[in-house]
Design a protein with these regions (language model features):
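Conserved hydrophobic positions within beta-strands
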Residues: 75-77, 109-111, 169, 275
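Conserved active-site neighborhood of the chymotrypsin/trypsin-like protease fold
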Residues: 79-162, 194, 218, 340-342
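Bacterial N-terminal signal peptides
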Residues: 8-16
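A short, Trp-centered hydrophobic/proline-enriched beta-strand micro-motif
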Residues: 43-60
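A conserved glycine-rich beta-strand in the N-terminal activation segment of trypsin-fold
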Residues: 31-37, 57-80, 86, 105-108, ...
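Short, conserved beta-turn/loop elements at beta-strand boundaries and strand-helix junctions
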Residues: 55, 114-118, 170-177, 255-257, ...
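Active-site region of chymotrypsin-like
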Residues: 46-50, 126-137, 163-219, 232, ...
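C-terminal recognition in membrane/secretory proteostasis and scaffolding
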Residues: 23-29, 38, 53-55, 64, ...
Length: 513
């Protein structure tokens, strides 16, 4: 199967980006003309262009932020005097403005809710009088059907005025939006290009979803977040914070293979999905390896782990979790050792990971002499993606950045601590190879549990020497004089124009007596 690369459909108006973020934009075929009668009255007035200045984190220079970039996308007016857009349009925004079609002025906005895992965000305007003349767009209460006609509204690159393209719904699937979050996704053949992100998709005068991505290696393939996902998001953030989508933390496999069925001694009438090993599973879960999940709620699960969603639509059974979860549990019917059982399986909002993402935050760091320490995050390890040489090297030495990428944290290892920047030039590390990207195993033979724990170990050390072991094969150890490292830190900060030795969370630990 051809693997498709997706672009986040926003306009990157910066003059240049870091080299590994550059992409070649292919020419898009002209969009199909839209008949005037297809445009709902006043809808154009409620689709806005979003301008944002982004200051993303720099995981390799964690004491600073990345250079600002100017981007633009789209948004749509919804109830409650709010603008709905995509998280990737306004994530890490230091400034946001919106502008309505044909308007001469921009209106300042504030990001009040973000769900990066499902790519949704809400804006509030500083001047809410805007909404007196810009009405909310009505949302459809049901999914569109495959082959339904849709219109994509937005402000794609190539012009300043509102663009409307026409297409049909070609596919509806339940797919992964991020590493640990899945949701419904609508595929359309309407042109959805950079800048369309956050614009509404309209069918029969109502919004059926929000544009968020397109395929870079194919023409006229776009993706829409359907209203069901939007409604879940809006309900979640009604209390002022985003908790995340409920998910069943269990790995399963299909039940198609006849030998597997014979091994499980299943009657031909039994269909479902088989529970794999439960190492990542909630200890409170009633599920065991080799259980066969046959139903979720009242929905039968077939041998490909799918449930029916209408006459001509099947999706992964996990889709029902977001509908059926109550009080942190979801009802399942299972077959175990030939017996049918009804169980309540726990659900959670995503998995906790040893290497998490920053989720909209900035990295914590601590500078000790010429060495910068930080937590390993998905953003930090992103340089391995697409870099076969680095990935092979890290795999060969057994770096936890590769070998433990999907692991959960534990009491012994809450997170991975890395040397997040090349050593600052200094005689204290003269003769050592640069340990950028190396994971800390121990300080003076004490295993490091977390970044906070490591800072406490350095603070409380009494020995003349500090011995740093790294978690890999063949990596040299580091031995430095404790007092010299402490004494040199201030001048190293000054020489490199760094204001703070560490982030507040870690300096509070370092300065604690």
């Amino acid at each position: 199967m051809t693997r498709m690369r997706f672009f986040a459909a926003l306009t990157l108006a910066a003059s240049s980006l870091i080299s590994n973020a550059q992409e070649t934009v292919k020419e898009v075929a002209p969009a199909a003309p839209v008949p005037a009668q297809a445009i709902p009255a006043n809808l154009e007035n409620s689709v806005v262009k979003v301008f944002a200045t982004l200051r993303r984190p720099d995981p390799y220079r964690p004491w600073s932020k990345a250079a600002p970039i100017e981007v633009s996308g789209s948004g749509v007016v919804i109830e409650g005097n709010r603008i709905l857009t995509n998280a990737h349009v306004v994530g890490y925004a230091s400034q946001v403005e919106i502008q309505a079609s044909q308007a001469g002025d921009k209106v300042s906005a504030t990001v009040v809710a973000v769900a990066r895992d499902i790519d949704l965000a809400i804006l509030k305007l500083d001047d809410e009088s805007f909404f007196k003349t810009h009405a909310p767009v009505k949302r459809a209460s049901v999914l569109p059907k495959v082959r339904d006609q849709v219109f994509a509204y937005g402000y794609p690159t190539g012009g300043n005025s509102l663009s409307i393209t026409k297409g049909i719904v070609s596919r509806i699937e339940f797919v992964g939006y991020s590493l640990d979050t899945s949701g419904l996704r609508i595929q359309v053949d309407a042109a959805i290009n950079q800048g369309n992100s956050g614009g509404p998709a309209i069918a029969e005068d109502k919004m059926v979803g929000l544009a968020f991505a397109g395929a870079t290696n194919a023409q006229n393939i776009g993706y829409i977040i359907p209203n069901e996902e939007i409604e879940l998001f809006l309900r979640d953030v009604a209390d002022g914070k985003y908790d995340g989508k409920p998910a069943l933390v269990v790995e399963t496999q299909t039940l198609e293979n006849p030998v597997l069925r014979a091994f499980l001694k299943l009657d031909k009438s039994v269909e479902g999905t088989v529970v794999q090993g439960t190492s990542q599973q909630d200890p409170a879960s009633p599920l065991k390896e080799w259980d066969v999940i046959t139903r979720i709620g009242n929905s039968p699960i077939d041998n490909q782990a799918m449930v029916k969603l209408g006459d001509n639509l099947r999706v992964r059974f996990h889709y029902r979790v977001q509908q059926l979860a109550r009080n942190g549990k979801v009802p399942l019917t299972i077959v175990r050792d030939g017996k049918t059982l009804e169980v309540q399986a726990p659900v959670s909002a995503g998995r906790k990971l040893l290497i998490p993402d920053l989720n909209g935050g900035y990295p914590s760091y601590f500078i000790y002499g010429p060495i910068v320490f930080s937590r390993a995050t998905a953003e930090f390890t992103s340089y391995l993606a697409g870099n076969a040489g680095a990935l092979n090297a890290y795999s060969y030495i057994g770096s936890p950045l590769v070998t433990r990428r999907g692991d959960a944290p534990s009491a012994e290892r809450e997170e991975l601590v890395v040397v997040s920047s090349p050593f600052f030039p200094h005689k204290l590390v003269s003769g050592y190879s640069n340990r950028f990207g190396a994971v800390i195993a121990s300080i003076n033979e004490v295993p490091v549990r977390s970044l906070a724990h490591m800072v406490a170990l350095l603070r409380d050390a009494k020995d003349e020497m500090i011995v740093i072991h790294f978690d890999q094969r063949g990596g040299e150890n580091l031995v430095v004089r404790r007092k010299e490292m402490v004494d040199a830190t201030e001048s190293i900060l000054t020489d490199n124009g760094i204001r703070m030795q560490g982030t507040k969370d870690l300096m509070d630990i370092w300065n604690k007596k």
